[in-house]
Every structure is written in structure tokens, then in C-alpha cells.
Amino acid sequence: MLLYTDEYWNDVDAVSKCIPNIDKLRGRTILITGATGMIGSAVVEILLHMNHTRNFHTKVILAGRSRSRIAKRFQLLVNNGDFSFLYYDADKGNLNTGTLKPDFIIHAASPADPHSFATKPVETMLANISGLVGLLDILKM
């Protein structure tokens, strides 16, 4: 389990203050794929931190393969009701947002581990491309 220390949140706060034009996300709905990965989880924590400390009122939609993994990863933040979960597998590009319409999409999902690239490079790149195409199709709706 990730330990959220005061020092950690101080770092998150410092990073959030360095992001140019971050106010454009205030009150918006943001879909994040790969929310439990290294980059995706950092983005989630920054946005939720800004909701709690600066009344950012950002609605965060976390898209991933496992609701329980997302709940476990963000267990100290999950009870605040700042985010929704959508099932998404980047390999399959199967995302149905239903009535949730994101203003922005942050695509951080990717089967990009070195083993996948070494053993199945074409399949890995196709998964990345088809996942991106599926997300772009959502924006066209």
C-alpha cells in the first residue's frame, strides 16, 4: 500500500503549482486511462489533491481493467466521491462512456512494458494505436 505522508502531499502540491494553465481543468470532467500506472496515478493524485485543497471541482473518470485495483490503489481517496470508474482495456480499445462525457482525455494506458515489446512488438504497438483510436472516437461523439 502506498503511504500518503505529509511530505508526499507537499510534493504533490508543489508539482500542481508548476503546471501551466492548470486552471483550464477547473470544473471540467477528465477521463484518465491507465489510472493505476505510474503516470496515470500521479495525474489522478494531483487532480484529487486540487479538488480537496483548492476546490477545483474537477470530475475525474478513472478508466481501467479492475475497479478493485483502482479502489485499492486510491483507497485513502476513494471515499471522497471525486471520481467514477469505467471499465477499459487498452488492448481491446473497449470504452463506453455512456452518459459521462469528458471534456479532456488523458491517455496513460499502455501495454508498454519491456517484456511485451521484446516478445510481441507488433501486437503491443497495435494495442497502443487501437486504444488511442478508440479514445479519439469518443471525442467525435
PLM feature segments, named:
Residues M1-F104:
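N-terminal Rossmann/SDR dinucleotide-binding element
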Residues I105, T119-M141:
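NAD(P)-cofactor binding segment of oxidoreductase domains
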Residues A108-A112:
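Conserved NAD(P)H cofactor-binding loop of Rossmann-fold oxidoreductase domains
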Residues D113-T119:
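Conserved mid-core segment of classical short-chain dehydrogenase/reductases
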